[in-house]
């Protein structure tokens, strides 16, 4: 049951990423509005209005929208979606009847934190964008560059043969904030896609690795020493223990195993001869981020005492969070006789009364773990990919709309001068296309690093270690999904440009 909360950090991390992107869209939309209403802002500032008053006026709509969305989300979360997601847990856990009740922590995470992010981010961003004098607003001079640069660009526009190329560059410069937002948006949504698409292969790979890394076909943990007759059975000692996880700020449950010195099941590594040295499993090494040469303090749950060991090796063939020492050393540590044992390694099923068995680790039990994880996370992941696609489409459409809305007069002039819709799209849509293509390729290493780090921190609450399996197919699928979404949105934007009534726009301009 403790694993049921393991998906919370993951969902919270993704929620924060999406809220930050939404905050970017709001901010860029408001900046576009400020540029349109610069003369009005200049008049208001000249009449004594404070910048802070204007900021709150502009961020009111984003806050109202975010608040309304949060309220709607809470209503749906406590009603419609509750029934959908509780079935996921009923499939894997034997739980009592679930009745949703108000939860203050959920309100903070899903409502207060998103509203706070939108409020703080937009306030700081918009306040900076209003950092001009009233005269600058009245003149619509809202650029932080010197006049000689502008004069140089105007000269280039007049003399350069490739007018469209130079004009496109000027559009990119005037909308560089939007293009930066596109890069950030592609980065975050690519993380979401990679995470979602790699989920199923990850669970399959996790199950396969667990089976491959079994020490033996049957591993028994006993309540009390029980003798059996078997040629393949080998005795070992194990105790429940824990290590402090610095990032989680809590103890991580592990198994401490005492292995026979000449074990046929542990023959790939040489057991430490020093009582203060230890071998840890690869999964434990990765989860604690401790490596050869580091020290690890293990707390015995039986005797409630701690001992610090030096890590001398990493054991790759282990399916859980475990550590290994000589059996005689562990027996001495837990104040037992030299011949004490409470477990068996075996290549065949042993005839042991179930009353004396704590647990049996074999291929079937390991497979059930990976299946259970996918049953819990699978429906969430599919929903997650769908929502990420919708989110990406809305994000790109909003940014493209902002760019075209800011340049409607220029587009109208181009149409009057006889430029076709295709030529105009080369100015406004092609730079976005190039930006997205470059971002999809260049950002891949950073995306892989980010998604693995997010996965690591998100899965800290799980008992065990789960590592993302990201193949080339996953990366390609993510890129194709992003490009397909973008093509659909760009076609809509191209249609909007082709239907733009330039006569009406020029007639109504200031």
Identify the meaning behind each predicted range.
Residues 2-9, 20, 38-146:
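Hydrophobic alpha-helical segments
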Residues 24-63, 394-434:
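Interfacial "coupling" helices/loops that link adjacent transmembrane helices in transporter permeases
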Residues 59, 63, 147-190, 403-408, ...:
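N-terminal Sec/SRP start-transfer signal
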Residues 131-148, 495-510:
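Short cytosolic juxtamembrane segments of multi-pass membrane proteins
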Residues 162-287, 294, 298-300, 376:
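Juxtamembrane segments of multi-pass membrane proteins
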Residues 214, 314-348:
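Small-residue transmembrane helix packing/gating motifs
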